[in-house]
A protein has these predicted regions:
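N-terminal secretory signal peptides that target proteins for export/translocation
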Residues: 1-7
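Bacterial N-terminal signal peptides
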Residues: 9-21
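Cleaved targeting-peptide boundary
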Residues: 25-34
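Short, contiguous alpha-helical
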Residues: 27, 46-57, 67-105, 143-185
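Carbohydrate-interacting regions of secretory-pathway proteins
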Residues: 32, 50-54, 108, 112, ...
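Well-ordered alpha-helical scaffold segments within catalytic/enzyme domains
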Residues: 55, 59-60, 94, 125-130
Length: 185
């Protein structure tokens, strides 16, 4: 029995090793190589964050404006409120990492266009923070709503928060018969 399993698994493993580079090259050839970047840690975090933010943008675009006030139950945020929340927290976390006061934002946007514009502004603000952030500064002290931590923690929380709420958005889309954009990248 062991030999039969080995006869199947060894060739499959060999093929996997040979094809893995080809498969990974097809995931997203446009991603920067963090190993070659001047700030590989910040670049790695930024790749994940950018991917999540792209997915959130696509979810915001995919949901019809008539469904922006949709909420699966009365005690959770609406689709629009999640997007507002993501924008506000992106501004808050990225400004904290940069050591600035968060830019003024408004909540309770009245249209899909305004909500998407604010979301785009928040993501662009974070882009500027990540692009100018050296790895050497990642262990600098930071405040996470009263918790003493470092800048690395703050920057990872931007991507973590986006991923958390992207999961909410996918559920809202599917409950409304809208297919989210697929894939890892």
């Amino acid at each position: 029995m062991f030999r039969t399993i080995a006869r199947v698994l060894v060739p499959v493993g060999m093929v996997s090793v040979v094809l893995a580079p080809l498969a990974s090259a097809q995931v997203s050839p446009s991603l920067p190589n963090p190993i070659a970047a001047p700030n590989p840690l910040t670049t790695t975090i930024s790749i994940f964050r950018s991917n999540m933010q792209d997915k959130i943008r696509k979810a915001a675009d995919a949901m019809p404006e008539s469904k922006y006030e949709y909420r699966p139950t009365k005690d959770v945020r609406s689709f629009a409120e999640i997007l507002d929340h993501v924008a506000a927290i992106s501004y808050s976390l990225c400004s904290s990492a940069k050591g600035e006061t968060p830019p003024a934002t408004t909540t309770g946007k009245v249209s899909k266009t305004k909500i998407v514009a604010d979301l785009k502004g928040a993501f662009e603000y974070c882009d500027g923070v990540y692009l100018g952030f050296p790895d050497a500064y990642l262990n600098a002290p930071a405040d996470f709503w009263g918790v003493k931590t470092n800048k690395l923690f703050i920057l990872t929380q931007v991507a973590n928060h986006d991923a958390l709420h992207y999961g909410n958005l996918v559920t809202y889309l599917r409950l409304n018969g809208v297919a989210p954009s697929g894939g890892w990248f």
